[in-house]
């Protein structure tokens, strides 16, 4: 069963004068073109009438002659030429659309990566260890770039660093440290009121990349959810660990153990809803979210990939939008930062891996291992690890001669990237955890 298809607001690149999806192009194909050029009105109806008359007169030869005359008449020849030209134009338009789409996708990646590189270079004027947000960390700098706040969703730690090159020793140093701790605690408390939508719209890299968030239509979940739940940001000085360095004061605050489970619990309704629509285990969806982002809704990577389930707009995003809308579209970052929309998109991609790419693998557990690995590295790499071939049919044939355990072991032995091996191990382990701890 296909998941519901809610309204989405991605960045879409397509010519306004032509249909762009395969179904739409088919609908604009032979039958429509024939009608447009009069085949049904003149050629087909006329030939039907003549043939019927000929048959009635038992003149089979005559009917063949009539049909031949119809096919070679000036009108029919002109119509056939027009139709051939129409098909050629249609194919040229579709080819041009695909080229425009590929160009737009490539420009999106280049624009994002350049904006990120420029921002890091700017930060290095103040920070020797300049860094930006990633899959498990959300990083924010003050306007003057002399303060840095890092929320680490994997370790449940908030770190505030304040540059203080003039810090000395003795009483002045103590006073500076006291001031830095107070400022750090204030920054931590602010996280409880900083909405996800605000964090996204004010991100310097998004702004530099030319992403306009003035008309972002986010779900109520994104509008209402903050970077950290307010109950976990009310910290005291006693909870802060302070470290003085040559160029800065570092204040670390460890969040309560319940913080991680709280984030998981917030995503559980989404995982259940979309997993049910896709015919998947909600524990699997939760394990993927945990492994991809540690439930960081603002997760991103340099590829770039965005959000809880780390959707890459230019690869997985194409499959997802074609499934949802019948055409490939470029999902924007703000769309994928929305938890609701991201979990739906990620679950659809899991569904496609499990039920399309590896649908002919008979054993359910075997198919699951292949889909998990493919979510990280792509179906082609998984196929090569199983069958030493990029063809999915070859991988399917080999997989159907193996047990699930043998497939798991072969993936762990043959997958080229250590990251993917660790990914498969973590997801399968965490799936069991969510099955047991959350009764999924």
Q: Which residues are covered by each model-predicted region?
A:
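Cell-wall glycan-active module
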Residues: 2-15, 19-22, 26-27, 37-38, ...
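Active-site metal-coordination segments of metallo-dependent hydrolases
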Residues: 259-262, 333-343, 418-419
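Short, functionally critical alpha-helical segments immediately adjacent to catalytic or ligand/cofactor-binding
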Residues: 272, 279-300, 311-312, 346-347, ...
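Secretory-pathway/luminal and periplasmic proteins that interact with or process carbohydrate-rich
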Residues: 293-302, 318, 377-389
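Substrate-binding/active-site groove segments that recognize
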Residues: 302-329, 341-354, 401-402, 427
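Active-site loop and adjoining helix of the penicillin-binding protein/serine DD-peptidase-beta-lactamase fold
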Residues: 330-333, 365
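Catalytic and binding regions of secreted/periplasmic enzymes and modules that target cell-wall glycans
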Residues: 342-392
């Amino acid at each position: 069963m296909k998941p519901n298809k809610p309204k989405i607001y991605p960045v879409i690149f397509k010519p306004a004068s032509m249909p762009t999806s395969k179904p739409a192009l088919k609908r604009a194909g032979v039958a429509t073109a024939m009608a447009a050029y009069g085949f049904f009105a003149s050629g087909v109806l006329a030939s039907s009438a003549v043939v019927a008359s000929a048959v009635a007169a038992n003149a089979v030869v005559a009917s063949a002659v009539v049909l031949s005359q119809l096919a070679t008449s000036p009108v029919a020849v002109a119509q056939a030429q027009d139709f051939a030209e129409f098909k050629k134009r249609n194919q040229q338009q579709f080819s041009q659309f695909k080229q425009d789409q590929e160009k737009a996708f490539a420009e999106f990646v280049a624009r994002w990566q350049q904006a990120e590189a420029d921002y890091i270079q700017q930060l290095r004027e103040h920070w020797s260890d300049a860094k930006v947000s990633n899959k498990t960390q959300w990083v924010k700098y003050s306007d003057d770039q002399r303060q840095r706040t890092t929320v680490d969703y994997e370790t449940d730690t908030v770190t505030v660093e304040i540059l203080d090159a003039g810090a000395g020793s003795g009483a002045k140093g103590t006073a500076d440290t006291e001031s830095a701790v107070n400022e750090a605690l204030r920054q931590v408390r602010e996280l409880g009121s900083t909405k996800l939508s605000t964090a996204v719209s004010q991100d310097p890299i998004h702004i530099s990349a030319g992403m306009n968030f003035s008309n972002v239509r986010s779900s109520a979940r994104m509008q209402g959810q903050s970077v950290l739940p307010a109950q976990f940001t009310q910290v005291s000085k006693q909870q802060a660990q302070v470290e003085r360095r040559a160029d800065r004061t570092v204040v670390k605050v460890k969040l309560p153990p319940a913080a991680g489970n709280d984030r998981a619990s917030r995503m559980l309704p989404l995982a259940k809803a979309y997993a049910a629509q896709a015919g998947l285990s909600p524990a699997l969806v939760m394990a993927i979210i945990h492994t991809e982002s540690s439930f960081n809704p603002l997760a991103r990577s340099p590829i770039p990939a965005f959000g809880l389930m780390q959707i890459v707009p230019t690869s997985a995003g194409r499959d997802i939008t074609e499934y949802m809308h019948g055409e490939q579209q470029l999902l924007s970052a703000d769309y994928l930062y929305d938890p609701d929309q991201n979990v739906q998109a990620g679950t659809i991609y899991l569904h496609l891996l499990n039920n399309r790419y590896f649908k002919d693998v008979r054993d359910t557990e075997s198919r699951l291992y292949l889909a998990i690995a493919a979510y990280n590295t792509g179906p082609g790499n998984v196929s090569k690890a199983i069958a030493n071939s990029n063809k999915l049919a070859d991988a399917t044939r080999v997989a159907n001669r193996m047990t699930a355990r043998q497939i798991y072991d072969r993936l762990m032995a043959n997958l080229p990237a250590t990251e993917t091996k660790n990914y498969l191990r973590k997801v399968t382990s965490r799936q069991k955890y969510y099955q047991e701890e959350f009764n999924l």
